[in-house]
Structures are given as C-alpha cells and as structure tokens.
Amino acid sequence: MTAPVKLAIVFYSSTGTGYAMAQEAAEAGRAAGAEVRLLKVRETAPQDVIDGQDAWKANIEAMKDVPEATPADLEWAEAIVFSSPTRFGGATSQMRAFIDTLGGLWSSGKLANKTFSAMTSAQNVNGGQETTLQTLYMTAMHWGAVLTPPGYTDEVIFKSGGNPYGASVTANGQPLLENDRASIRHQVRRQVELTAKLLG
C-alpha cells in the first residue's frame, strides 16, 4: 500500500479569511488521501494593535489550538501550501518572518523537490493578489521546489476569478463563496495527486 502524501498547509490569518481558506485546503488534502498538518505562523503584531480590532482578536481566539509552524514541519512535508493575505502587493511580515527561519533547511537542500503551491486574499480584486502569489513562488524557486499552481486545469478557476497562480479570495468579512472553496479544493487535490506521482 502506498504511503499517504505528507502535506503541510502553512498560513497566516488576521481576521479569518486566511484561516477559512487553510481549513478548506486541509479538508481537501485529507479527502485526497494526504496526511495533513494545518499550521499557523507566529503572530508578530503588537498586542495593542490587535486589541484595537475586534475581528482580529476573535480570529486569534478561534485559532488558539492550531499549532505554530516550525522548520521541522517543512522538513517532514512532501507537499507544501503557503497561504498569506496580501500586504502592499506581497506576503505579510508574519509569513516572511517564518520564511526567514528556513535558511538552514534551504542550505542543506531539505526543501528541494517538494511540491509547492500558494493561496492569498485581499480586500479588493486589484489588491496585489497575483503579485503576492508570485513572490511566494519565487521563494519556493530558490528552494528548488516543484511548483504546482492550478493553472487553468479546471473550469472552476474561471468561476472563482481566473487566477492561474493559486486560489485568491477577495475578502469582505463574509464566508467563502462556493466557487472559492471549489477552487481551493481543486488546487490542493491536484497538488496531492501530482506529489504522489512524483514520489512514484
């Protein structure tokens, strides 16, 4: 019997959209037969800033039982999904801070040949969603990872906004739309399937 693909979903979320996307990705991974670790990156924002936003405080409480990602989690993984909201056209400082802890794994080649895809969200359609995904993929390219963006491999990509780089959601404080959820499911299922093929 073939061992399940080891999938790490590493996310940052301030007000809940990213957490919802990561949960959807985790469910899709399990449905595809993967062993899944759902992991948040460490919060680095000052507490007084967080306390000034009710949605942020509520989301931190909702995520309290989600373990924090470590380099060891990425060493374990065979497939990696990063999810970060857009901040000024790139990933959040919290996600970048986590990425900056991975130098040891990178220098020893332990991130090479893992599959990688990415997801993001922003408050508006032109809020830097594509550039955020591209910068995350650029990081994975430095690792020697195998990029597995969804492209236009399913009709749902067009229905959810047409982003070939990865699932991207225009956040408005509401639950994820079904097309967004379906796009995430397709992306993760495809990545798990491709990873299994690469592992032989």
UniProtKB/Swiss-Prot annotation:
Name of the protein in its database record: NAD(P)H dehydrogenase (quinone)
Organism: Deinococcus radiodurans (strain ATCC 13939 / DSM 20539 / JCM 16871 / CCUG 27074 / LMG 4051 / NBRC 15346 / NCIMB 9279 / VKM B-1422 / R1)
Free-text remark on how the cofactor is bound: Binds 1 FMN per monomer.
InterPro entries on file: Flavodoxin/NO_synth, Flavoprotein-like_sf, Flavoprotein_WrbA-like
NCBIfam families named in the record: flav_wrbA
Domain of life: Bacteria
Lineage of the organism: Bacteria, Thermotogati, Deinococcota, Deinococci, Deinococcales
Family stated for the protein in its record: Belongs to the WrbA family.
Record-linked Gene3D superfamilies: 3.40.50.360
GO cellular component, one term: membrane
EC number: 1.6.5.2
